[in-house]
C-alpha cells in the first residue's frame, strides 16, 4: 500500500516542487494549504486549482486570521520591502508561521495514520526566516515524536525537507525534471490586482535570480517595472 504524506502546499514555487518530489518518492500526497489573512491571496487560488492535477489525493484548506495579531508585512498594513534581501530578518517574516503550519500538518497526519510530512523550507536562497533553518526542523521533529500518540507508540514521524540545501536554481531544475509547470505557481508577496508579480519583493527577487541562474525564463506574469 502506498505510504501517505502530508505536504505543506502554498501554491508557491518551493511547495509545488516539494509536492512533486514527494510523489516521485512514492508517497500518496495529501496537500495542506492555509488561508491565514495573507495579503498575497493569489497563491491560494493557484493552490486550489493545481493541487489535484499535481497528484494530491486530497487538498485541505485551513482558515484562520493572523491579521488579528499583525506583526508582519504579510498580515498587516506594513509596506512590503522592495529593496532586496538584507542581512536582518525582514518584516515579511510572519511570527511562528511554520510552527503553526507544522502543527496543523501534524494533527492531520495523525488523523490520516500518516508518519511523513513534507515542507519546502530552504536555508540557502531564502529571506533569513528563523523557522526555515535545519535546527528548527530537527527540534520540531523531536517535539512531534514526544507530543503525539503515534510517537509515544513508537511510530516515528519524519519531517522531510528535500529543498533545504538546494539553491533556488537547483530547486527549479529539479522541478522541471519532474514536469512541474512553474507558470502555475505564485511567489509574489505584493501582487497587482490581476495577479501580476511585482518583481521587486524578496520572494520575486529570489525567484527571478533562481530562474536566471537555471538558464530558464520565468513563465509567470510580472508588472512592468
Swiss-Prot record:
Binding-site list for Zn(2+): 188, 198, 201, 204
List of residues binding ATP: 9-19
EC category: ligase
Keywords recorded for this protein, A-Z: ATP-binding, Ligase, Metal-binding, Nucleotide-binding, Queuosine biosynthesis, Zinc
Pathway recorded for this protein: Purine metabolism; 7-cyano-7-deazaguanine biosynthesis
Single Gene Ontology BP annotation: queuosine biosynthetic process
EC number(s) per entry: 6.3.4.20
Catalytic activity: 7-carboxy-7-deazaguanine + NH4(+) + ATP = 7-cyano-7-deazaguanine + ADP + phosphate + H2O + H(+)
Single annotated GO MF: ligase activity, forming carbon-nitrogen bonds
InterPro entries for the chain: QueC, Rossmann-like_a/b/a_fold
Extent of the signal sequence: none
A Pfam entry, by short name: QueC
Required cofactor names: Zn(2+)
Cofactor note: Binds 1 zinc ion per subunit.
NCBIfam families, per database record: 7-cyano-7-deazaguanine synthase QueC (TIGR00364)
Family stated for the protein in its record: Belongs to the QueC family.
Function of the protein: Catalyzes the ATP-dependent conversion of 7-carboxy-7-deazaguanine (CDG) to 7-cyano-7-deazaguanine (preQ(0)).
Listed name of the protein: 7-cyano-7-deazaguanine synthase
Native species: Citrifermentans bemidjiense (strain ATCC BAA-1014 / DSM 16622 / JCM 12645 / Bem) (Geobacter bemidjiensis)
Record lineage: Bacteria, Pseudomonadati, Thermodesulfobacteriota, Desulfuromonadia, Geobacterales
Gene (UniProt): queC
